[in-house]
A protein has these predicted regions:
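Helix-to-loop junction immediately C-terminal to a conserved catalytic motif
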Residues: 51
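ABC ATPase nucleotide-binding domains
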Residues: 240-268
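Conserved ABC ATPase signature
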Residues: 137-141, 145
Length: 268
């Protein structure tokens, strides 16, 4: 399987500060990569560098073999869809209007949305199962619904790579599950090639649930890259997070979870 996204010996930072270096990994079309690591480990800065919001300090980012260095913003927007953490918002757009903004790279900032743009937005809303929210006020929907709408906006861009910054942060358990299920479906595709997905989280269980690969960042370096089972081990969690955990298989399918040893002792 050929690489859709390739990161080669990447160094990244901002201002005068180098945050990370020597980072390399590949992700194929239809694969989900989970980015794990402690606070301050460089995840957000790495994302900004992948997206071209910060220039790389060294190394390369390639999409389908093409070096993205020097790409203009419009070309980047056609390759990368970005889903930030869902904030409360400030303007009373409808959900449909918010999703239509994802079509800007296809039409220009000052052009009216075309019939094709509206169709793409409607298709994204329906694919995420939120077509019923189309006329709702963006400021009056729940955090989980806003997160789904942001994913729909990125999907309307028709990107090749979807980047999500902690997509389940501040969501309740049910909405976390629904968002993760949708992310996995987008990678799997609907009768065709799925998206390449890169998402960050602080919850190793989410990597076990939906990721094909895990990149574990620690101190700006790639501590380990591989399958969730290869990366998320008791030894690596101790080394990177300074926490004793037990990685156990649960349920009929044997999905793995991390159990903090200290908390288990407190609970008897």
């Amino acid at each position: 399987m050929s690489a859709r996204l390739s990161v080669e010996d990447l160094a990244f930072g901002y201002g005068e500060r180098v945050v990370g270096a020597g980072v390399g990994f590949t992700v194929a079309a239809g694969e989900v990569l989970c980015l794990l690591g402690p606070n301050g480990g460089g995840k957000t800065t790495l994302f900004k560098t992948l997206l071209g919001l910060l220039p790389p300090r060294g190394g390369r980012v390639r999409v389908d073999g093409e070096d993205t260095a020097g790409w203009p913003p419009r070309r980047r927007a056609l390759a990368f869809g970005y889903v930030p953490q869902a904030g409360a918002g400030q303007f009373p757009f409808t959900v449909r209007e918010m999703v239509l903004m994802g079509r800007t790279a296809h039409r220009g900032a000052f052009s009216a949305p075309s019939v094709a743009d509206h169709a793409a937005a409607e298709a994204a809303l329906e694919r995420l199962g939120i077509g019923h929210l189309a006329e709702r006020d963006w400021l009056r929907i729940s955090g989980g619904e806003r997160q789904m709408a942001l994913i729909a906006r990125a999907l309307a861009q028709a990107p090749r790579v979807l980047v999500l910054d902690e997509p389940t942060a501040s969501l309740d358990f049910g909405n976390q599950v629904r968002v993760l299920e949708q992310v996995r479906r987008l990678a799997d595709g609907e009768g065709g090639e799925g998206l390449t997905v890169v998402f960050s989280t602080h919850h190793p269980e989410q990597a076990f649930a939906i990721a094909d690969r895990v990149a574990l960042l620690h101190g700006g370096r790639l501590a380990r890259f591989g399958t969730p089972e290869e990366v998320i081990t008791a030894a690596m969690m101790r080394e990177v997070y300074g926490t004793e955990v037990e990685v156990v298989a649960v349920g009929a399918d044997g999905m793995r979870v991390c159990l903090p040893v200290g908390l288990r002792r407190r609970m008897g």
